[in-house]
Amino acid sequence: VKCRWQEGNRITLLENGDQYYPALFAAIGRASRRVILESFIWFEDEVGRRLHAVLLEAARRGIQVEVLLDGYGSPDLSDEFVGELTAAGVIFRYYDPRPKLMGMRTNLFRRMHRKIVVIDDTTAFVGGINYSAEHMSDYGPEAKQDYAVQVEGPVVLDILQFELENLPNSETARRWWRRRRHQ
């Protein structure tokens, strides 16, 4: 994202999932218009189910919710997990959705590794934290160490513009999900 310097932004550093998830889930809970979420990894563990719940609740409140996940980093979400979101109106997409040639992945090095969330065009979360319990301190010695920032202010519109320019067409996403579900 290329942005010009702008005054009036507020940035909060969030360390690991212990700080990131509560801040993000609360912000999604306050959303009044739109949530756009991109991530490399989203697992169906405790953290992933909590994210699922807050996005589902937002969609049921009439909030426009769009999700873009990497097809390699998040290949194992169940049809029920994703289907419940799409049934509620969530636009759900996979980046480069696992093409194979003779049963082998052909796209190992083409990934979407961004972790960005934009809420109501006023708040953004940007960083390195995926959606898995591995980012929580109670995961144990193998817990992942990472950071994100919560951003508020004029720069959020630049982040939003980047998101809107890089999200695939919504109708294409819905058709692809229907094809994947019926394979």
Region roles according to the model:
Residues 3-34, 38-183:
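HKD-type phospholipase D/PLD-like phosphodiesterase module
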